[in-house]
């Protein structure tokens, strides 16, 4: 590893999802305590790879996001350092103590919620991008050294929550920002169903998306797949996703759609033809709407008896867009 590397780690801290993940009925149950111990081992490996490596840890909690650790704050000596221990390496001791304590504090703050709001993954992703931008363009008089400013940046998302269709546009905006900053986004789906938006984030930024088949091998996945920085991945065999789900969320109902109708003016996506675009207020001819409605494929009913010719599985569009409103 020639140059330094920066890692921004985003941890999904949804209490309900981690409760489900730890159930003994799962093929490979994974508790949050075991998960966190493996994550700390992984970040220690990142720190040990090179002295100039930097680290930031963000927590995506229900309804909010928070920074749990920053190597810049640790180097500045903010008074929160753990007591010295002759039997442990100080940087490891600091990151383990700070991440564990701050995570517990954040979870205690949301413990009294009667209803769990969606996890603020987009907020954590935005904070990670802002932190990386601050590293790349440090203000005058800041504590960011030259090695940290020139570090190879990447973001690793450890996700357990399902997709939130309403966050489609903010996620895409974050992806475009990551592309502009040349930031690689890696995703490890630890528990739950596949996430459409995070698949696209990893694919569009040149990162890796891995769905854990064996959660009892979580640490091995982290070390073998996500420890090497992007600058070294062209010379090693890093697992890649075989297929990418490019479906989008409609702007009208925030649902993920297989077939979308796209406004030819502002590129807004709708699940059905509309007379007036709700985004740019463009009006479409009635003949165009009739033609698009007539061309919509027949959807088989729930009892399996179709009134028309159902599409074969291979015919499902991979882009999420099939028609344009003109």
Language-model segments: which ranges?
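Intrinsically disordered, low-complexity, Ser/Thr/Glu/Asp/Lys/Arg-enriched terminal regions and linkers
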Residues: 1-236
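P/S/T/G-enriched low-complexity
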Residues: 144-151, 174-181, 188-326
């Amino acid at each position: 590893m020639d140059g330094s590397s920066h890692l921004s780690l985003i941890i999904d801290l949804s209490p309900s999802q981690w409760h489900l993940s730890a159930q003994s009925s799962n093929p490979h149950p994974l508790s949050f305590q075991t998960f966190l111990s493996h994550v700390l081992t992984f970040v220690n490996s990142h720190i040990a790879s090179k002295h100039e490596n930097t680290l930031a840890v963000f927590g995506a909690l229900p309804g909010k996001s928070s920074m749990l650790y920053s190597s810049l704050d640790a180097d500045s000596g903010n008074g929160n350092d753990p007591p010295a221990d002759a039997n442990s390496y100080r940087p490891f001791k600091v990151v383990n103590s700070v991440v564990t304590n701050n995570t517990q504090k954040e979870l205690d703050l949301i413990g009294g919620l009667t209803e769990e709001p969606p996890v603020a993954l987009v907020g954590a992703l935005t904070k990670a991008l802002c932190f990386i931008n601050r590293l790349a363009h440090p203000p005058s008089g800041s504590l960011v050294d030259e090695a940290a400013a020139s570090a190879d940046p990447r973001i690793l998302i450890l996700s357990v929550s399902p997709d939130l269709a309403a966050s489609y546009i903010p996620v895409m905006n974050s992806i475009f920002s990551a592309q502009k900053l040349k930031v690689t986004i890696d995703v490890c789906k630890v528990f739950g169903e596949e996430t459409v938006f995070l698949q696209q984030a990893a694919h569009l930024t040149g990162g890796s998306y891995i769905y854990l088949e064996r959660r009892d091998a979580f640490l091995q996945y982290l070390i073998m797949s996500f420890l090497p920085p992007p600058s070294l991945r062209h010379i090693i065999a890093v697992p890649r996703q075989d297929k990418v789900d490019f479906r989008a969320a409609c702007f009208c109902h925030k649902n993920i759609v297989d077939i979308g109708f796209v406004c030819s003016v502002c590129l807004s996506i709708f699940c059905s033809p509309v007379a007036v675009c709700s985004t740019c207020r463009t009006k479409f001819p009635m003949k165009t709407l009739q033609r698009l409605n007539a061309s919509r494929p027949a959807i088989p009913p729930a009892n399996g008896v179709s009134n028309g010719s159902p599409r074969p599985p291979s015919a499902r569009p991979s882009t999420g867009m099939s028609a344009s409103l003109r």
